[in-house]
């Protein structure tokens, strides 16, 4: 089972395949990451590999975090993430994780925080239909009815209404890696991924129930 990698979204572009078709892609600067901790079943209760990504200033790192990072011989990393694995024998503390762990044509799942849009109304947040726009109408973008009357006499929990939109963790599954640029640590992924340019992303081999052939990748 291959672990994932952390990266940064650079933006979207286009990629021309072998047949000359234009494919929308997202450029991701992935890694290099360092293995900062190996968690075993004996000491931690489960097997996992923890990696770190992105350097930061020393003044922003507290003493316990410094001691944790010193075990892997790495500098002051900003982001940590761990992946469950079955066999820890193929991983080594302090080893580097790069885009070379992936292959062109491989399916991956990409997770990140979606762009926050603040307080949004019914149309923008839930794609509700608007009201009449003709002269005299007073409910152009109003919610309309939100429930019954005396019975039940309340609005059921979970009713789709206006509120804060975006800014949540989103996972886009089954994206195809179109190209890998090892010299610049770039992954060219087909389609769009969550977040705005510069946001943190978690890229890992695709894992979907009933689709064993999607994982692929190198150990």
From Swiss-Prot:
Biological process annotations from GO: translation
Stretch list, region Disordered: 124-165
Pfam families referenced in this protein's UniProt entry, alphabetically: Ribosomal_L3 (PF00297)
Keyword Heme among UniProt keywords: no
Classification via SUPFAM superfamilies: Translation proteins (SSF50447)
UniProt keyword annotation of Ribonucleoprotein present: yes
Superkingdom of this protein's organism: Bacteria
A GO molecular function held by the record: rRNA binding
Record's GO cellular component terms: cytosolic large ribosomal subunit
Keywords: Ribonucleoprotein, Ribosomal protein, RNA-binding, rRNA-binding
Role: One of the primary rRNA binding proteins, it binds directly near the 3'-end of the 23S rRNA, where it nucleates assembly of the 50S subunit.
Family per record: Belongs to the universal ribosomal protein uL3 family.
Assembly information from the UniProt record: Part of the 50S ribosomal subunit. Forms a cluster with proteins L14 and L19.
HAMAP family: Ribosomal_uL3_B
PANTHER family hit by this protein: 50S RIBOSOMAL PROTEIN L3, LARGE RIBOSOMAL SUBUNIT PROTEIN UL3C
Full protein name: Large ribosomal subunit protein uL3
Gene source species: Prochlorococcus marinus (strain MIT 9211)
The gene coding this protein: rplC
């Amino acid at each position: 089972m291959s672990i994932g990698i952390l990266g940064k979204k650079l933006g979207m572009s286009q990629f021309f395949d072998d047949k000359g078709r234009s494919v929308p892609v997202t450029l991701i600067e992935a890694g290099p990451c360092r293995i900062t901790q190996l968690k075993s079943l004996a000491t931690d209760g489960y097997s996992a590999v923890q990696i770190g990504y992105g350097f930061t200033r020393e003044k922003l790192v507290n003493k316990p975090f410094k001691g944790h990072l010193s075990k892997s011989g790495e500098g002051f990393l900003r982001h940590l993430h761990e992946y469950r694995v079955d066999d820890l024998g193929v991983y080594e503390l302090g080893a580097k994780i790069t885009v070379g762990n992936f292959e062109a044509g491989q399916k991956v799942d990409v997770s990140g925080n979606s762009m926050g849009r603040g307080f949004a109304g019914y149309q923008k947040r839930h794609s509700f239909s608007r009201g009449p726009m003709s002269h005299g109408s007073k409910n152009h973008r109003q919610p309309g009815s939100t429930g019954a009357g005396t019975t039940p006499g309340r609005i059921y929990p979970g009713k789709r209404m206006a509120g804060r939109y975006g800014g949540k963790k989103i996972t886009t599954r089954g994206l195809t890696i179109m190209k890998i640029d090892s010299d610049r640590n770039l992954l060219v992924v087909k389609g769009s991924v969550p977040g705005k340019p510069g946001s943190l992303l978690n890229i890992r081999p695709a894992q979907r129930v009933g689709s064993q052939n999607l994982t692929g990748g190198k150990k």
